[in-house]
Amino acid sequence: MAFFGLSRVSRRLLKSSVSVTPSSSSALLQSQHKSLSNPVTTHYTNPFTKCYPSWNDNYQVWSKGRELHQEKFFGVGWNYRLICGMSSSSSVLEGKPKKDDKEKSDGVVVKEASWIDLYLPEEVRGYAKLARLDKPIGTWLLAWPCMWSIALAADPGSLPSFKYMALFGCGALLLRGAGCTINDLLDQDIDTKVDRTKLRPIASGLLTPFQGIGFLGLQLLLGLGILLQLNNYSRVLGASSLLLVFSYPLMKRFTFWPQAFLGLTINWGALLGWTAVKGSIAPSIVLPLYLSGVCWTLVYDTIYAHQDKEDDVKVGVKSTALRFGDNTKLWLTGFGTASIGFLALSGFSADLGWQYYASLAAASGQLGWQIGTADLSSGADCSRKFVSNKWFGAIIFSGVVLGRSFQ
């Protein structure tokens, strides 16, 4: 139950609104027992709204698909419908990091409020969630290979181009959002059957497929504006990645290796970043960099896929989590080792300094920690390990910058 620090005024309001006397206590318990056997939906009125009218504006989540939720208030059971889907978790009110993005209570999924629910106008919340703006880890994972490549393309003794890093950062945000929109449009029949995804905007009915297609058009148009800032070679190379972006969501229906296909897609920036700076490709440098990203993706996205493995079996979709099974950590160790090896080969071809190899040692430790400590039976722990990969990317980037700057 969410903890409410009560002021004197609030306690007075509560006292006047909820008073339990010995004579009424038994009646309340009897009525509560009766309500449990024959549930009646009533509306819960937060006493804070009498003193602070903005309370509901800040902490109510306007979304669809919420069901009856039971809460206990000072020892008295109350049945009420979560008005507009307000979460009962204390992490939102107290500002603490949430352990998981959902809680289950008797089969009911309660979604925690994000900054989108608290601060954005109601009209745009669905679109912001469709682009996963409240979950930036996907943008980081798409952006880091681009940044590695841009830093590798810098001249010896120089820092990477801030112009290209800014362009690719914005491009990563837009392309990741477009990829999520495409994924939700193609997977809406699957998302409704998986606990983790059933509240996504299109699957839950918050947005229609037509609205999703219109939003996708806007995302791609903005992405085109960024692509046109690059040279002709990079424009063609960047546009060719759309085939992978549109194909990836379908792979889980046909192969146990959709994570490998995601690796080919999300690490395309390892090729594009270099060509944007240099105007051509250097296979001995960027191909090992690209392959290292693919192997890295197989590590983190397999860990991520273990969150949904039970639902995947029920729905009939495939993943490396199901393919590897009990041997997952052995496979991940192999892919992690290959990723570090390809990174070392790329750095050697680029003639980077010793600072780069020191960063590889640190990145190896981070990746080994992920694989060694991941609890693949815990969705929350898999999610935490997945999110930690932004630090792996940051370590490699810092190593490339230092190795090139002191070259």
Curated annotation (Swiss-Prot):
Keyword Membrane: yes
Chief site of localization: mitochondrion
Enzyme class: transferase
Family of the protein in this entry: Belongs to the UbiA prenyltransferase family.
Consequences of knocking out this gene: Arrest of embryo development at an early stage of zygotic embryogenesis.
NCBIfam families cross-referenced by the UniProt entry: ubiA_proteo (TIGR01474)
HAMAP family documented for this protein: UbiA
Pfam families: UbiA
GO biological process, any: isoprenoid biosynthetic process
Function summary: Catalyzes the prenylation of para-hydroxybenzoate (PHB) with an all-trans polyprenyl group. Mediates the second step in the final reaction sequence of coenzyme Q (CoQ) biosynthesis, which is the condensation of the polyisoprenoid side chain with PHB, generating the first membrane-bound Q intermediate. Required for embryo development.
Swiss-Prot/TrEMBL keywords: Isoprene biosynthesis, Membrane, Mitochondrion, Mitochondrion inner membrane, Transferase, Transit peptide, Transmembrane, Transmembrane helix, Ubiquinone biosynthesis
Catalysed reactions, as listed in the record: an all-trans-polyprenyl diphosphate + 4-hydroxybenzoate = a 4-hydroxy-3-(all-trans-polyprenyl)benzoate + diphosphate
Native source organism of the sequence: Arabidopsis thaliana
Compartmental location: Mitochondrion inner membrane
Known tissue expression: Expressed in flowers.
GO cellular component: mitochondrial inner membrane
Protein topology in the membrane: Multi-pass membrane protein
Protein name, entry field: 4-hydroxybenzoate polyprenyltransferase, mitochondrial
Molecular function (Gene Ontology), one example: 4-hydroxybenzoate polyprenyltransferase activity
CDD domains: PT_UbiA_COQ2 (cd13959)
Organelle transit peptide: 1-20
Cross-referenced InterPro entries: HB_polyprenyltransferase-like (IPR006370), Prenyltransferase (IPR039653), UbiA_prenyltransferase (IPR000537), UbiA_prenylTrfase_CS (IPR030470), UbiA_sf (IPR044878)
Keyword Membrane on entry: yes
Pathway: Cofactor biosynthesis; ubiquinone biosynthesis
Lineage: Eukaryota, Viridiplantae, Streptophyta, Embryophyta, Tracheophyta
Signal sequence, start to end: none
EC number, UniProt record: 2.5.1.39
Bilayer-crossing regions: 137-157, 162-182, 210-230, 254-274, 279-299, 330-350
